[in-house]
């Protein structure tokens, strides 16, 4: 194809807003600022916020954002069996993965990769993202970023709670539905 898919463009725009929020104009931005993680909200992915970012800043973010999304797509293919963007049922999960994988150290850390795989499937199979998707997006992004800051010592409460809810939602995906009973 000679043009980007609408799914890719939307994810790219969301990630550009997140990068702008964390960078505050600093090209060497970090996703490890606990206060910024805590104050993150869905407004940074909305049109009004994105239209206020100067074009020269966006130009500086695009390569980094594309790299994060490409890493996330590779992760989804290699670790989760997702072959095409159309197979992602909740596209903002791709943005969460893309955000995490902006950090090269996290992308190369096997513990972070294992954690992200557990988070991905737990979020899907627990029904975490089935309603109030924007709130679920921010809640998951904040908790994932917080839990991987120090992956070896993190208690991973959020992800453990998701794991405990896997296949328990009678209206979404309980054992009987999955086993087609």
Positions of predicted regions on the chain:
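Generic intrinsically disordered, low-complexity segments enriched for polar/acidic and small residues
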Residues: 5, 18-19, 26, 46, ...
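Intrinsically disordered, low-complexity N-proximal targeting/linker segments that flank membranes
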Residues: 125-181
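Charged substrate- and nucleic-acid-binding regions of tRNA-handling and nucleotidyl-transfer enzymes
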Residues: 1, 90-96, 107-146
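Short linear sequence motifs
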Residues: 14, 42, 113-114, 165
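Surface-exposed polar/charged interaction patches
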Residues: 18, 22-25, 75, 79, ...
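Polyanionic (Asp/Glu-rich) segments that form extended negatively charged tracts
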Residues: 1-102, 106
């Amino acid at each position: 194809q000679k043009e980007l898919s609408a799914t890719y463009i939307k994810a790219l725009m969301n990630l550009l807003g997140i990068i702008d929020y964390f960078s505050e104009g600093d090209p060497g931005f970090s996703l490890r600022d606990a206060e910024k993680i805590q104050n993150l909200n869905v407004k940074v992915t909305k049109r009004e916020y994105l239209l206020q970012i100067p074009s020269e800043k966006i130009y500086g973010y695009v390569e980094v954002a594309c790299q994060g999304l490409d890493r996330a797509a590779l992760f989804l293919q290699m670790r989760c069996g997702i072959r095409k963007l159309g197979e992602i049922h909740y596209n903002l999960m791709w943005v969460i993965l893309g955000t995490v994988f902006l950090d090269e150290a996290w992308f190369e850390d096997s513990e972070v990769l294992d954690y992200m795989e557990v988070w991905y499937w737990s979020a899907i199979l627990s029904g975490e993202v089935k309603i109030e998707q924007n709130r679920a997006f921010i809640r998951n992004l904040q908790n994932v970023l917080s839990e991987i800051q120090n992956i070896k010592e993190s208690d991973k409460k959020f992800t453990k709670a998701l794991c405990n809810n896997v296949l328990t939602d009678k209206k979404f995906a309980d054992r009987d539905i999955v086993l087609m009973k």
